[in-house]
Amino acid sequence: MVQISEVKDQVPGSSAGARTAAHTHIKGLGLDEFGAAKQVEGGFVGQVEAREACGVIVDLIKAKRMSGRAILLAGGPSTGKTALALAITQELGPKVPFCPLVGSELFSVEVKKTETLMENFRRAIGLRIKEVKEVYEGEVTELTPEEAENPLGGYGKTISHVIVGLKSAKGTKTLRLDPTIYESIQREKVSVGDVIYIESNSGAVKRVGRSDAYATEFDLEAEEYVPLPKGEVHKKKEIIQDVTLHDLDVANARPQGGQDVISMMGQLMKPKKTEITEKLRHEVNKVVAKYIDQGVAELVPGVLFIDEVNMLDIEIFTFLNRALELEIAPVVVLASNRGMTTVRGTEDVVSAHGIPPDLIDRLLIVRTLPYTQDEIRVIIEKRSKVENLQLEQAALDLLAAMGSDMSLRYALQLLTPAGILAATAGRTEILLSDIEEAKMLFLDAKRSTKILESNSNYL
């Protein structure tokens, strides 16, 4: 067969690594083995006390001694609250559920606010199900469907059984399978040379990939080549599946319909978002508790992160008080950039961070401090490296001063426009003049407010 390979055009800036988000540079909390934060580490600069406090929280979550508690990240805008929450998730790893949302997301026309919050609570609680299954695993050496006369008569024939030969590192086996499994084999598009495994109880067939013995073949379709399975063909295999409690709620709230036309048409229509009843959740919790007692499953409390918590109203705060006391609850991380302000849904209740006093009493509060000019300079320098931009020293000093006087976000947002201005002028390095030109083109919040105040009839 003729080898055909596709050569993609290399367009500068088009690679996946070139796409940068606001917190691309955050890699973790930047703590040493003793839990002490370094001044510059993991994408963070400064915020030593806040990072060390978050490190203690991560240790408590890993030890499963933190569920049902809440943390508040309190500080001004551009002090790294969202970055801290993101770093907590990266320290916990991908197996721990993390559910981020903003306070305004809880308001819906179809579903009441407390129901939406409860859904997100359940999304942040994981269940790791361990199951030992008997499987046949190996490379397919033979695949022969055997036919028989149709018992109903006529000229057609039916498949009576399927002969499948499997080979592993320690031997071979020939299996005689039920004809219903042949449909699964066809669905998975299994052919001789593929590595598959068949569950002996359910008869489920899974194609793992193509055997690496066929790696020298060339095909138009890209194949995933896998090594020959070790051990015997027939073996016991531990299968671990990670689901959330919300997945179990939805699976039981929306059972699959029948195969008739009316059921199929009902599934095609856009389903209206419905509430999951408390009774159903209670039944799911009982089944989960039974699995945990049997040692089949393990509960993994995750993290629910609510940003702009001051946007919640008094009803949600009241519900949150009760939800934190549930037997199965995640770690709740709240973030607020407000000081003394009125609690939403009330007329005269003024409280710190826009949160009622009774809920504040339950919170562990982590404070984030404003960055100094030297810290802002280091942040801008690191961010410019992430965006592949070169800054001269004078331009870096001006951006650091602007970040201190105006805001860190504004200084960081000027990096890309200044880079484009420098590239237009035929330079790879951003000069002081590029920053000044970008500053003239794009206003910051303070200058925009001054213009509006001096021209009161403008709008």
Swiss-Prot record:
ATP binds at G75, G76, P77, S78, T79, G80, K81, T82. Disulfide bonds: none annotated. Keywords: Activator, ATP-binding, Chromatin regulator, DNA damage, DNA repair, Helicase, Hydrolase, Nucleotide-binding, Nucleus, Transcription, Transcription regulation. One of its GO terms (biological process) is box C/D snoRNP assembly. It catalyses: ATP + H2O = ADP + phosphate + H(+). Pfam families: TIP49 (PF06068), TIP49_C (PF17856). It comes from the Eukaryota. Its EC number is 3.6.4.12. GO terms for molecular function: 3'-5' DNA helicase activity; 5'-3' DNA helicase activity; ATP binding; ATP hydrolysis activity; DNA helicase activity. Its main location: nucleus. PANTHER family: RUVB-RELATED REPTIN AND PONTIN. DNA helicase which participates in several chromatin remodeling complexes, including the SWR1 and the INO80 complexes. The SWR1 complex mediates the ATP-dependent exchange of histone H2A for the H2A variant HZT1 leading to transcriptional regulation of selected genes by chromatin remodeling. The INO80 complex remodels chromatin by shifting nucleosomes and is involved in DNA repair. Also involved in pre-rRNA processing. May form heterododecamers with RVB2. Component of the SWR1 chromatin remodeling complex, the INO80 chromatin remodeling complex, and of the R2TP complex. Belongs to the RuvB family. This is RuvB-like helicase 1. It comes from Eremothecium gossypii (strain ATCC 10895 / CBS 109.51 / FGSC 9923 / NRRL Y-1056).
